[in-house]
Amino acid sequence: MSRLTLALDVMGGDIGPRITIPASIKALEKDPMLSLLLFGDSQQINPLLEQVPSALKERLRVCHCSRVVENNQGLSYALRHSKGTSMRLAIEAVQKGEAQGCVSAGNTAALMGLSKVLLQPLKGIDRPALISLLPTMDGGRTVMLDLGANIDCNANNLYQFALMGAIFAENQLDLVFPRIALLNIGIEEIKGYKSIREAADLLTGNSSLNYIGFIEGNLLLNGKADVIVSDGFVGNIALKTLEGAAKNVISLIKGKSRNHLLKPLFNWLIKLLFKDSYQRLQKINPDQYNGASLIGLTSIVVKSHGAANIEAFNNAIHDAALQARQQIPEKILAGLQK
């Protein structure tokens, strides 16, 4: 494990430092080779560090800034008024080489916009995409992109997403020749938008890619594909639907015993009978898993859920560290040049 520095926008998210600071400390405890730059309001940050052991404090630095990109700011406004904000300064730290990656739970559009401007897309990539790993019902994982960075995509955009997703899957999942599918409303060749059908033709024409055809929404988690590609509009809706369904089922299971006199026994039986299913549902519960990466840039940027809890934001930090150590941008660039 190599030494690594990450820049964190600790003011981002629905709660801010009360979540991001404990998560940062947890990340330092788990990763002895990790150092963190904490960008945010020192008056809010420092009290949360008072009980932190000095050995951990040596691996973090508070970078004070009083300005924040608000969640309700539109993209153009956020970009024009981003100077001196915790989000922009964290990304600039990566741009300057002071950190090897950035993590933020802040305004998604602003994070993507600033990252594109300051870090630049890789040569050969027109648009970066949001990518994440999802659990499958057979116990494995699948890569899915785009999850919201690009609402409208042409065939070449989708083709590039597939290339990046395949390289990401090879490294994150240790796969050879990962199976690629396009998310569509049917599996027949005539189905879907023109851009999807044209992307299918491009993928079919590349013998170095293992394109297996279209996949429908009801099969996203069945393990049929290792990489699932869509535009950001469809991908974001699909992801939020999966997350919402998982949370609702988990709440339903827990709620059955809410007023039961034998609640402890009932809870034990639920865990025993539905242990495997419950654990798999938890993996797509945004409270448990977290972190979508903005792939296709020259550096690592991970977007955490705005409503992330401590464990979830810690997972986003872990994802950023892993991708930086795996040199994902460099491997994508090398793959594009083959």
From Swiss-Prot:
Q: Which UniProt keywords apply?
A: Cytoplasm, Lipid biosynthesis, Lipid metabolism, Phospholipid biosynthesis, Phospholipid metabolism, Transferase
Q: Is this entry keyworded Cytoplasm?
A: yes
- State its location(s): Cytoplasm
Q: Quick one: a GO biological-process term for this protein?
A: phospholipid biosynthetic process
Main localization is cytoplasm
Gene3D superfamilies per record:
Isopropylmalate Dehydrogenase
Outline what the protein does. Catalyzes the reversible formation of acyl-phosphate (acyl-PO(4)) from acyl-[acyl-carrier-protein] (acyl-ACP). This enzyme utilizes acyl-ACP as fatty acyl donor, but not acyl-CoA.
PANTHER family given in the database record: FATTY ACID/PHOSPHOLIPID SYNTHESIS PROTEIN PLSX (PTHR30100), PHOSPHATE ACYLTRANSFERASE (PTHR30100:SF1)
Return the similarity comment. Belongs to the PlsX family.
Protein name listed in UniProt: Phosphate acyltransferase
Q: Which organism is it from?
A: Mannheimia succiniciproducens (strain KCTC 0769BP / MBEL55E)
Question: What is the organism lineage in this UniProt record?
Answer: Bacteria, Pseudomonadati, Pseudomonadota, Gammaproteobacteria, Pasteurellales
